[in-house]
Amino acid sequence: MSLNDFLQTLSNAVGEKNSNTLEKCIILDPSEPSFQQLSKTLFLDRKGKNKLNGTIQKEFGRIRGWKELVTTYFEYVENAASSPDQRKWELLQNLYSNLTTCFSHIDGAWLCTIVKRVSKLYVKLSLQLDTSTPTLEDSFDGNGFIQRKYVSDASRNVLRTFNSILSDRQQNINPSKKDAIFCIANLLCLLYFRLKQIRLCQTIQANVISSGADISRATMAELVTFRYYLGRCHLYQRKIHQAKDHLLFSFLQCPDECYHQKRLSLIYLTTCLLILGKSPTKGLLEKYKLTAAFEPLIKALKSGDIKSFRLSLEDNSRRKWFIKRGIYLTLLDRCEIILWRNLFRKVFLFTFEQSQKTPHVSGSYLLTAARLSTNDNSYDMDDVECICVSLIDQGYIKGYIIHASSTLVLKKDPSFGFSVIESLMPIARNDHAEKEFFHANA
């Protein structure tokens, strides 16, 4: 196909808003035969190349952004295959910026499919370069964070695309710019997590929920990914119930062949479950190679073995593994109270006698258990009473302390005041808009 024929086909696609034809024209993979053929034509057709700018101006100059888009696409085709990744990224970024301009037109919704495809490639290459580019000594910002040029630039450009989607107020049209909202939101979350700017993810997610986007227009893969990141953000905010619900959906709906993605969901789902007094089955942990990471913690939590839990969490390799995934502090902070609750329950059940009119446990037993479980003899009765008061105040134990006799008196019911942990954890700052968004689109 000559350059003139290619440009005519491309011009017709733009004029007719034919996304299928445009998809066939805009090829980004240098290994594709059509890409190679166009690249060869650009190289060989010197006469056509000299007239190229004039032809592009004639065919595409009437619509803002399209002349620049076609020009940068030809630059990409001509140079991408022979350029290093850094140069290829620059070419792709120029192309993406102009594509976003075209997409921002009031009637740009027909470009949704190609915008999603180019966005994915752009973000993928940005992340690859971020990983492969060595960190320089002076590449830190004023706050001490690593400056990530490729990811930072990508996040700004993809955010521009996202804002274009949000600003589209047209209702009940097909296609709609909002057809791309979940894909673009997920890419932004991926970039923001790499940048450790999780609060920006929360802003993106809130905008998606308030946008009135139709979940039925999203693919299951997009929805699974969106709820995975939503669960991660809720876990970051210590909203454990909400995090568990989204991560459970993400894990269950993710296809079995997507092993890595299911494993990621299970890592954070398991973290939520431990805080809620639950745990996955051994078989599930084994299947996703998480036994070494979580089984020692689960065993210690169930038995109230505080020393073993701390040693397991502080194990050098395990600690690094948890820190890398951003759950170390969450486990350290939220599991401590569960350990004390389970330890005191274990002591009560071991010492309880049916002859007791009111269930209770002596503080001396609790003190002995505290010293043994922590391997710390510095604990005294005041410490034990403070722990009991904290457990009662947070609802983990229903009862009261008799200070004079150092006795923990428990509620007279089948659970003896030790209610199911999940029912005690508060649903912090329940977001009704979020709940209604997923319920309305169920």
From Swiss-Prot:
What is one Pfam family matched by this protein? PCI
Q: Which domain of life is it from?
A: Eukaryota
Q: Quick one: a GO biological-process term for this protein?
A: transcription elongation by RNA polymerase II
Residues in PCI domain copies = 224-415
Q: Which GO terms describe its molecular function?
A: double-stranded DNA binding; RNA binding
- One GO CC annotation: nuclear pore
Q: Which UniProt keywords apply?
A: Cytoplasm, Nucleus
Where is the protein situated, by its record's location annotation? Answer: Cytoplasm; Nucleus envelope
Primary location recorded for the protein, binned into one broad class: cytoplasm
Task: Give the protein's recorded name.
Answer: PCI domain-containing protein C1105.07c
Query: Whose protein is this, by species?
Result: Schizosaccharomyces pombe (strain 972 / ATCC 24843)
